[in-house]
Swiss-Prot record:
Listed GO MF terms: ATP binding; metal ion binding; threonine-tRNA ligase activity; tRNA binding
PANTHER family named in the record: THREONINE--TRNA LIGASE, CHLOROPLASTIC_MITOCHONDRIAL 2, THREONINE-TRNA LIGASE
Cited CDD domains: TGS_ThrRS (cd01667), ThrRS_core (cd00771)
Cofactor: Zn(2+)
Taxonomy of the source species: Bacteria, Bacillati, Cyanobacteriota, Cyanophyceae, Synechococcales
HAMAP family assigned to the protein according to its UniProt record, in alphabetical order: Thr_tRNA_synth
Reactions mediated catalytically: tRNA(Thr) + L-threonine + ATP = L-threonyl-tRNA(Thr) + AMP + diphosphate + H(+)
Cited SMART domains: tRNA_SAD
Keyword Glycosyltransferase: no
Region described as Catalytic: 242-533
InterPro entries on file: aa-tRNA-synt_IIb, aa-tRNA-synth_II, aa-tRNA-synth_II/BPL/LPL, Anticodon-bd, Anticodon-bd_dom_sf, Beta-grasp_dom_sf, TGS, TGS-like
The family this protein is said to belong to: Belongs to the class-II aminoacyl-tRNA synthetase family.
Annotated organism of origin: Prochlorococcus marinus subsp. pastoris (strain CCMP1986 / NIES-2087 / MED4)
Protein name: Threonine--tRNA ligase
Amino acid sequence: MPEITLPDGSKKVFEKPVTIQEIAQSIGSGLAKATIAGKVNDVLFDATLPIDNDSKVVIITSRDKDGIEIIRHSFAHLIGHAVKQLYPNIKMAIGPVIDNGFYYDIFSEYRFTPEDLIKIENRINNLIKKNYDVEILQVTKKEAIKTFQERDETFKLRIIEEIPDEGLINLYKHEEYIDMCRGPHVPNTCHLRHFKLLKLSGSYWRGNSENESLQRIYGTAWAKEKELNDYLKRIEEAEKRDHRKLGKKHSLFHIQEESPGMIFWHPNGWTIYQVLEKYVREILNKNDYLEIKTPQAVDKSLWEKSGHWDKFREDMFTTASENRTYAIKPMNCPCHIQVFNQGLKSYKDLPIRLAEFGSCHRNEPSGALHGLMRVRNFTQDDAHIFCTEEQIQAEVSTFIDLVFEVYKTFGFDEIIIKLSTRPEKRVGSENIWDKSEEALMKALDNKSLKWVLQPGEGAFYGPKIEFSLKDCLDRVWQCGTIQVDFSMPIRLDATYIDLNNEKRNPVMLHRAILGSFERFIGILIEQYEAKFPIWLAPYQIILLSITDRNIEKCLKFNQLINSKGYRSKVDIRNEKIGYKIREATIGRIPLIAVIGDKEEQFDSVALRALDGKNLGIFKLDDLYKLMNNLIEKKGRTE
């Protein structure tokens, strides 16, 4: 007679083992119809499995976060059901849930096309309409092997081989189709309604390019039709803003096969990069950072001392010269300690803040590369603060202010903060972990900031705070971080003389605001849809001649404007002025200045904004004042 305790504290006693579906029915038929699964003593549980013992039970519907995850996982199995009906000879690999959706990796000699995707989606819709029950079979490992041997599902058999012999394996039966999963899954396809198959891509078994090539089908699913439609609109908008497309369209950068994951910056894109670097440098200078530059290639002995050789050797590019092996640096921290170590340091010298626009290389898998967002060569706005334990809180507090100042400049007002604390495997005393975690928490709390605790998610060498920004499409990008490090200063012999004239190791704070220039510029391209604010735009103003008579004045004004430090260009082609204005608008140039006979007569320009707003007639001195004001605001309206 299991006693079931519900979330409101009420209890129900049943005469025999009971399912979550039956518990829901005892509360109400409406809840029973909506029930997808449940939690039994905080463990996810299928709606149709019996509960034998006294338990705490939570009923899950599509309104719950766990509910939508279960729906998405069930849709992945539906892909398998549909694809196996349409293409019986294919083999199913894995089909997990991902952010906002799901995918299934499939081995097939036949190459799927977008037309096949439509066919598969139609078959899924037909299966959903049948409202069939999804049956769960709990079997032994031996029985699972037999099941998938009969179906010649080689990838499933490989997965089963890795499962311990003891215990039961969950198989989910969709009519004639059987798949395996930890579960839970929906009890009936009536819960599967609002979905869309999105795209095809390639992948490899276990993500290893030396293994079999697979084909991946991506999809999304939601509890309500409106949620699905809203998401599809966001996808459409994201495709329109794709930095790779806009980068090509506006000649910002390109990537080519001869140098995968490394950026060829064009003049327009490099201008944005340089303006961004100048801005960050000004921020660093205002906050007493010392800018340094360290070598690209460093003997492997330093990486062995720092511990990176053992942990990250496979991610490093290496080269050899005169019987010595060098690593192209994947990060800057060991080199910054070498700069700190030059000369004796006193506690009076601390904190010392060393910053570098450090170019790093990491041998990312080719399949993971993605435009500017995931590259092999990137530049970090990297800095390391060498300080005492007592200075951690003040340094972190100042850094938090910097992060918010910079993100606000670019229009990012919603910042998500996560604090990661000590993992099980760690270095350093409990005392210093206590002090460090308390310092980070106090720095956040003293500013009345909301933050999320991630217990055990810190690095082995110290706790950290991560700063993620939310863009105009509600996507979250983790960019900034500040990380406490007790380990590396010890490993690389960084010391200072304390108040008692004794040598001590400083604490090192790793910190970055943008993360990498490449990725941050990619985010900005998509955030602004390449309509950069005037301070950041490759060209800030374009001068258009109406007739050939106005070309000379156009060129003269252009020279004067550029001599003042603005970024200006001309369009003096023999084209109609309407066409030139459209071209300048498509080119995303913030200010468009037209010069005709009337403007030339009064030594002025007719100015319009990128959005088409007529700003009026301006003489050059007034134009400079306007541009200075817009540039100083950096696109902010307050």
